[in-house]
A protein has these predicted regions:
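Compositionally biased, low-structure terminal segments
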Residues: 6-8, 102
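Cleavable N-terminal signal peptides
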Residues: 4-6, 16
Length: 157
């Protein structure tokens, strides 16, 4: 007896606007360049880390004048934002309001970690961590780098 099998292959096309947006190396380097330009204009020196949404390092730069541990701190800030989805500046308040939060993995309660959202503000694609100056200056550097790359620091609803 012969059996006949019919295989039906269905492909589904995802609309362009719904396709996955990722943080590539070229874009990460543009963020670093924008942050560096901002820092130089302010006569500051930062260590900058750019990670994807999984917290994996995509680009980094330690500007002249920073100590050896500063790069690690920048990466920790970026990875904290990748893990939690909100700026490190807000983690201090979250730690005050939520007992035990400060003991959770990847929590950094110092400003300088900022999320990276796609240009349309609909997809979180990574994070930037900057360290080496006052926390507010670190955050401003990260935000300037993100803006220079044509991306957003927050979601657009």
């Amino acid at each position: 007896m012969r059996a006949a099998f019919l295989f039906l292959v269905v492909t589904v096309s995802t609309p362009l606007e719904a396709q996955q947006v990722t943080l590539d190396a070229r874009t990460a380097q543009a963020i670093v360049a924008g942050c560096t330009a901002h820092a130089k204009a302010k006569k500051q020196s930062h260590a900058i880390a750019v990670v994807d949404v999984g917290g994996h390092l995509v680009a980094a730069l330690r500007m002249d004048g920073n100590g050896s541990g500063i790069m690690d701190f920048s990466l920790a800030k970026a990875q904290a934002v990748a893990a939690w989805g909100f700026p490190t500046a807000e983690m201090e308040q979250a730690a005050k309001e939520t007992p035990g939060f400060v003991n959770a993995p990847h929590v950094v309660t110092v400003a300088g970690g900022v999320p990276v959202w796609s240009a349309d503000g609909k997809t979180r694609i990574g994070a930037v961590g900057a360290s080496g100056e006052a926390p507010a200056d670190d955050a401003a550097c990260a935000e300037a780098g993100i803006a220079a790359a044509g991306l957003r620091t927050s979601r657009v609803r």
